[in-house]
Amino acid sequence: PVLGAANPRTGNNINDDGRPVILVIGDSLSAEYGLQRGQGWVQLLANRLQKSGSNYTVVNASISGDTTSGGRTRLPALLKQHRPSIVIIELGGNDGLRGLPVARMQDNLAAMVRASQAMGARVVVAGIRMPANYGREYTERFYAAFANVAKQHDAALVPFLLEGFSDSPDFFQADRIHPSAQAQARILQTVWPVLEPMILAKAPAKARS
């Protein structure tokens, strides 16, 4: 199985109105697969920023079914178009579900971090775990890859995107792969403590005035 099938949606970008951009490049875990529009954690993040008066805008460039190879291919054009201040990379789940080499996934993630940083963006890497039936050796190497990339390239890390509910069927859709609507706030709670310091550390001048 692969993680989903929904279309990416984009928001305002810094080239249009001068607002700093948070770019989320991910798969169905960020693309509202199986959810009503507006229920996903990325939209909840945008809502939180808006309610707090933050000057940031969120661009969701997530595509269900995407892999790190797909993200690596798509990212340069997204960076050029949106000039993000922060990039959240939420990819790798489909690499794992397909049993693709961990070394290749790690190389793709590292390339995406470097490309984002080269454009002046700060980066958050969101990790994911594979089910135990993929074998201990593979699942451990897979999970470690996200931390390795973050450490080697001085990126922030969300160790496990589905922290706190991955073993709770009530928080998943019928396929037991994709988080349900009620899980989306939990995902944001996991991402927010890592993301918030980035937002506060370099508040845009427009927000401070």
Tell me the role of every PLM-derived stretch.
Residues G65-S69:
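Acidic-and-aromatic substrate-binding clefts and catalytic sites of carbohydrate-active enzymes
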Residues L3-S64, R74-R83:
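Serine-esterase "nucleophile elbow" of acetyl-processing enzymes
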Residues P1-P8, V123, S180:
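Structured catalytic cores of enzymes that bind and process phosphorylated ligands/cofactors
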Residues S54, G70-S209:
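Alpha-helical cap/lid subdomain in secreted, periplasmic
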